[in-house]
Curated annotation (Swiss-Prot):
Belongs to the bacterial ribosomal protein bL34 family. GO terms for cellular component: ribonucleoprotein complex; ribosome. Gene3D superfamilies: 1.10.287.3980. NCBIfam families: rpmH_bact (TIGR01030). Keywords: Ribonucleoprotein, Ribosomal protein. This is Large ribosomal subunit protein bL34. It comes from the Bacteria. One of its GO terms (biological process) is translation. InterPro entries: Ribosomal_bL34, Ribosomal_bL34_CS. Disulfide bonds: none annotated. It comes from Vibrio vulnificus (strain YJ016). GO terms for molecular function: structural constituent of ribosome.
Amino acid sequence: MATKRTFQPSVLKRKRTHGFRARMATKNGRKVINARRAKGRARLSK
């Protein structure tokens, strides 16, 4: 029995969990965005 691949890509799932709107929805998510802004990241979220 082969083990299944853990990465099953879905754009919708990715956006809902790691997207910009999802980050902004929570206090800790906003902390993530601000930390990435302070670091000078080109991409703040997926």
